[in-house]
């Protein structure tokens, strides 16, 4: 299972799922399908927020914020780089996933095919066959953003709820809620669709002296 925690990858969204209303424009499901079908490469920036609360009437509070940039080429090749507050990089070359923690000078290595599955990363970086791993439905519109909810078909997934938002076909954010009630929000910006990418952009070279942990 491809799961990235507060200092790793994936999660997301812009707003709470609770207040959504019916949407306009093309439906969110249609926008998502168009995105995964028509965008084979992309690069952009993100802000990731870990949110606590929101259950039993408790207020939402931001427990942590990080930001960075990403680049991907479907299927299964990407670099997801955290810049602040900690430097960390996740690199996938289509076969292997490498998670490099600069502070620890440590690399975690695992096979990518066993990592994507029904994970949030599969939505952004995987193939365009979303229906194989997810059930999709319209999530409504909030503040001009159309949302689609994705429910993993796998029973052993960590995530109870995944949502991804678009505005006029442009990717805006993701939201993840795990089995423990924790929510991660991702806001995307400065996205370039289908840029020409250097051939070696997804080639990971371990830094000298780094510890390597194979999983």
From Swiss-Prot:
Provide the primary localization.
Answer: periplasm
Where would you find this protein in the cell? Periplasm
Q: Where is the signal peptide?
A: 1-26
Q: Which UniProt keywords apply?
A: Chaperone, Periplasm, Protein transport, Signal, Transport
Q: Which GO terms describe its cellular component?
A: periplasmic space
Pfam families from the UniProt entry: LolA
Entry keyword annotation includes Lyase: no
Provide the GO biological process annotations: lipoprotein localization to outer membrane; lipoprotein transport
The record's similarity note reads: Belongs to the LolA family.
Q: How does it assemble?
A: Monomer.
Could you tell me what this protein does?
A: Participates in the translocation of lipoproteins from the inner membrane to the outer membrane. Only forms a complex with a lipoprotein if the residue after the N-terminal Cys is not an aspartate (The Asp acts as a targeting signal to indicate that the lipoprotein should stay in the inner membrane).
HAMAP family referenced in this protein's UniProt entry, alphabetically = LolA
Record's protein name: Outer-membrane lipoprotein carrier protein
Q: Which organism is it from?
A: Ralstonia pickettii (strain 12J)
């Amino acid at each position: 299972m491809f799961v990235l925690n507060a200092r790793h990858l994936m999660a997301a969204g812009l707003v709470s799922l609770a207040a959504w209303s019916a949407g306009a424009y093309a439906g969110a499901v249609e926008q998502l399908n168009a995105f995964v079908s028509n965008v084979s490469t992309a690069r952009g920036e993100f802000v990731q927020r870990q949110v606590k609360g929101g259950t039993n009437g408790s207020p939402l509070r931001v427990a942590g914020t990080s930001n960075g940039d990403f680049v991907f080429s479907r299927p299964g090749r990407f670099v997801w780089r955290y810049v602040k507050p900690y430097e960390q990089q996740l690199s996938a070359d289509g076969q292997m996933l490498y998670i490099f923690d600069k502070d620890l000078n440590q690399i975690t290595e695992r096979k990518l095919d066993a990592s994507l599955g029904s994970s949030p990363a599969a939505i952004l970086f995987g193939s365009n066959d979303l229906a194989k791993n997810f059930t999709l439905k319209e999530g409504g519109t909030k503040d001009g953003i159309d949302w689609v909810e994705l429910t993993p078909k796998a029973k052993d997934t960590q995530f109870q709820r995944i949502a991804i938002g678009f505005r006029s076909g442009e990717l805006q954010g993701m939201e993840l809620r795990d089995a423990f009630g924790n929510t991660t929000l991702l806001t995307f910006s400065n996205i370039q669709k289908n840029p020409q990418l250097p051939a070696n952009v997804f080639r990971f070279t371990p830094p000298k002296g780094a510890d390597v942990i194979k999983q």
